Amino acid sequence: MAQVQQVPSSPMNGIPEKNGNGLSIEESASTAVAALAHIQNGAVLFHGTPTKDLNGASTSIDTDDLQLSPSDLRRRSTRASALKAQEKIKLKDDIVQGPQKRANDDDDMEDEELGDEINEQSAPKKRRLENGKEFDQTCFRFGLRANNEGEVYAMTDESENSSIHESEMEVVRYHYEKMKNKEPDEEQLRERLNMRREAENQLREEEAKLLVLRKMKDSQTRAITKLAAETKAADLAEATSAAYKPAVATNGKSVTNGKNSMIESNNKTMNGLKNLSIPQQLELLQKLSSQSPAAKQAYIMAKKNPAQTTQLFQQLITINNQNLQKQKELSAAETNASASASPAVQQSQQAQQPQQAQITQSKLLNQQTPAQRIQAARLAFRAQADKQLTTIPTQKSQPHDITFLPNPNASAFLALHGLDLVVQHVLKDRSNETPYAGPSYECEECKTECAHTWKAIGSTQDDLHLYCENCVRSAQKRKNRTDQTALLKRAFQKITAQEKLLQEFEKKIAEGQLEQYAEAKAAAPATSQTIPTSSTATVSSIPLVPRLPQIPSSTGSSTPTQAVKTSTPIHSTPKSSSSSAKKTAAQLQQQSMQGMNQLFSTAMLRNNPQMQQMLQMYQALAMGGGAANMANNQMAMLFQAQAMQAAQAQVARAQAAKAQAAQAQAAQAQAQAQANREANQQSMLIQALMSNGQVNVQALQQLQKLTPEQQKALIEVVKRQTRK
């Protein structure tokens, strides 16, 4: 048996080799000694192949150390071959990956060294903000923004805030939120107010420009419309030539003038047509062809022979003028016929008009149901009530409680609170101030002694009552409230009376008496116009006495009488005797005589001969005819009443003129007296100011009563005298 020598395993690059079971080569070799094969010729064999060490030298093994059976050697040799194959694979991987791993290790070491150097010497950062607590959002470098989650970040690298570290970002976020929620200071508010005012001024200017443009457009439109209307009227006047006069008022000159005007208009038209070309004349004829058959015939002929267009136009104008003349003659004949109609026909037509209106009204009333009539009456009442309420004037503005000093340019600046007295009291030099030695003022209403303004109210200078400003204003307010309340009460009373009438009207409608009421109203004027022809004739329900309600009596105790209106017509009854007629005629004659006497005396005083003559004629007619003639002669009564009314109107006008003249004279005298008083007061004030330079309380009160214009004039006079 040959001896087997154990071969020690050499490390590869200092790393011991391991087999697949995780054991090193030495351990596997010690356990696999029994697996070695037989050694022939003094060499170790693995499956009959001699082995070498890692350096290529042959290995000699002492065969005396170990003797194994063939089965053990076979088993051990198989395991050893597997281990040897694994060793070869590892050796190959070590040869390929060894230099790369060493290079990677060297790079890692160099990177670590460079990182240490960079940490020791870091690159310079970007320029930071001078003050991190303030940001200018208007600057383009302000790149901080906040997202929906509230996180603040830098938008671009150009932002000055991009160099801020993460540790400083919390401070930046805090100041940014504080700046966003910060309230504006006074300067910012002032700037915003100025910007707002500038924007409002610009808006007003734009609105003013727009308004001016609208007005200009409207004026241009009106001018164009007016020019078009004037042009149309001028064309119409030229077309219809001169105005037509009826045959009754015409003479030879007017006829010749009309013919001359027609000739002139024809010449103008022909001159205008000469300026047009033949195609334009044909186009004009085509437009006129739809108006008359003659123009259509002329257009057809001109289309066949365009050279005769001007002559056809002249013929067409002549035919048109002849037609116009015929129409004027026909209208004049109709006017003359209507003017020559009898006045009786016109009077009958005028008399039929009220009857037709009454018939139409009755038909309308018959067509409506009672409910519709009541509804219409209520609507009319409501419309009338609304109209009355809208006519009520508004309440007068209440006087304001002034607790401040108004504008110095206002008229009530000095007279309101006595500002001049306050200034004199505050000044250091009190030489101009004169103390008031009299008793203190006291209000007659509230008995107060302290008021900033006093009011002296009275009809004359000797009858003046002193009141404070508060009492005067409260009295004015009470008066305004009382007047408004009285006005509303009167309106309410009117509406209440109308409501009562409406209720009565509705009651009549419900009872079916509306037709009778309407017939009574319609029969009232007809019965008033009936004239009795004899003493046995019926007496009208409404006599003629109301026609003379305004005739005054000599004693002045007469009152006008009014006709009594009833819902149903009162039928006249025949008289049993003429005593009542005689009494009525006597009373009527007495009243008329009294009125005539008064008017006659007035005419005598006024020296009006025409009025005297007319009244004498009417008086003689009345006295000569007697009572029966006065009752029968209604026309004379009517003339007499008209004459009396005219005389009364003349007397009233004369009295009004006299009263107006007296008022004007009194006003002139009062104005002259007021001017004299003001002149005297001004002279006294000037003397007081120029004498000692001191002003007493009365002078100050007079100065306060002056208007600003009077005060300015007084100051100018004082300045002029001081200069002299």
Curated annotation (Swiss-Prot):
Keywords: Activator, Coiled coil, DNA-binding, Nucleus, Transcription, Transcription regulation. InterPro entries: P66. The keyword Calcium does not apply. One of its GO terms (molecular function) is DNA-binding transcription factor activity, RNA polymerase II-specific. It is found in: Nucleus. Transmembrane segments: none annotated. The keyword Transcription applies. Residues 1-12, 56-70, 527-541, 551-564 have a biased composition (Polar residues). GO terms for cellular component: nucleus; NuRD complex. Residues 1-23, 55-129, 328-361, 523-590 are annotated as: Disordered. GO terms for biological process: chromatin organization; mitochondrial unfolded protein response; negative regulation of transcription by RNA polymerase II; positive regulation of transcription by RNA polymerase II. Expressed at low levels in excretory cell, pharynx, vulva, and posterior neurons in adults. Strongly expressed in the excretory cell and more weakly in the pharynx in larva. Embryonic expression in the excretory cell. Its main location: nucleus. It comes from the Eukaryota. Residues 332-358, 565-590 have a biased composition (Low complexity). Residues 105-119 have a biased composition (Acidic residues). Residues 186-216 form a coiled coil. Residues 85-95 have a biased composition (Basic and acidic residues). Transcription factor which binds to the 5'-CCATACATTA-3' motif found in the promoter region of pgp-12 and activates its expression in the excretory cell. This is Transcription factor dcp-66. It comes from Caenorhabditis elegans.
